[in-house]
A protein has these predicted regions:
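Short beta-strand/loop segment that forms part of the nucleotide-sugar
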Residues: 34, 41-51, 71-73
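A conserved acidic beta->alpha catalytic loop
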Residues: 49-58, 102
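Short, well-formed alpha-helical segments that are part of the catalytic scaffolds
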Residues: 22-37
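Donor nucleotide-sugar binding loop of glycosyltransferases
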Residues: 22-25, 52, 79, 105
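Hydrophobic helical membrane-anchoring modules
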Residues: 1-12, 156-159, 181-245
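Acidic donor-diphosphate engagement hotspot in glycosyltransferases and nucleotidyltransferases
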Residues: 29, 56, 83, 107-109, ...
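Acceptor/aglycone-binding surface of glycosyltransferases and processive sugar-polymer synthases
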Residues: 69, 73-89, 94, 106-186, ...
Length: 245
């Protein structure tokens, strides 16, 4: 009942789900989203199929009631490209990006959304490392790498984030200009967050639980992802400072 009083009002929450060969989890994710986000009246669930070659497209075709819109790419161009396609389908309200692999639990969304609308927040970044109720043990080098790039981001942007690569960010759509985005790989989240921080007045962080996958379960990130992330942080900040981007 605590959620319903405010969630029946605008603004709108647009949940973007980039998908590539997620036949094992996509219907589970969509079903769970529809269930836990039912109190959020003003919402859109937008699926972006980034050239899946398994049965994901057929599953989506058979379950149209589980989403508001389906955007398809004929070939796989990467998550960054899929996110841009999704953002281009949204013109107002807020955006949240939900991965299709269930590392991030949709049960968290109503609580996070309540925080955003109750406090009129521009950007809410979540953290797996700040008082999270339950977090699966990380790979040591992943955690060290994440802490390193978070520290660099904080120094360059004068912030105090604890986990800049947490998968859940809720932000006002108007704060991200897709034509300004130059990164399509691992660096894109750092690029987007840099723009968000520098275009926002009210930026907050909230803890979430996290169930990270193992490499056997399909985890893809590795140490080589750090280089484009570092470059994205520095390059985007320079663009903002010198080109007023």
């Amino acid at each position: 009942m605590g959620y319903i009083s405010t969630m029946s009002l605008k603004p709108e929450l647009n949940i973007l789900i980039p998908v590539f060969n997620e036949e094992r989890t996509i219907i589970q994710v969509l079903t769970k989203l529809n269930k836990v986000c039912k109190p959020i009246v003003n919402k859109n669930i937008i699926v972006i199929d980034d050239g899946s070659s398994d049965v994901t497209p057929k599953l989506l075709e058979k379950n149209k009631k589980l989403y508001s819109k389906l955007v398809t790419s004929p070939v796989n161009k990467g998550k960054g490209s899929a996110i841009i396609l999704g953002l281009n389908e949204v013109s107002s309200g807020y955006v949240l990006i939900q991965d299709a692999d269930l590392e991030y639990d949709p049960n968290e969304i109503p609580r996070l959304w309540e925080i955003v609308i109750s406090n009129d927040i521009d950007v809410l970044l979540t953290s797996r490392l700040s008082g999270s109720p339950l977090t699966r043990v990380h790979y040591f080098w992943h955690k060290l790498g994440n802490k390193s790039i978070t520290l660099m981001f904080n120094i360059i942007n004068n912030t105090t984030f604890t986990d800049i690569y947490s998968g859940y960010i809720i932000f006002r759509r108007k704060l991200v200009h897709t034509k300004s985005l130059k990164f399509y790989g691992w660096g894109q989240q750092a690029e987007i967050l840099t723009y968000l921080k520098n275009r926002s007045k009210k930026v907050y962080e909230a803890p979430i639980s996290y169930k990270g996958r193992t490499y056997e379960e399909g985890k893809k990130i590795n140490i080589y992802a750090m280089a484009p992330v570092v470059f994205a942080i520095i390059w985007t900040r320079l663009r903002i400072l010198f080109f007023k981007d």
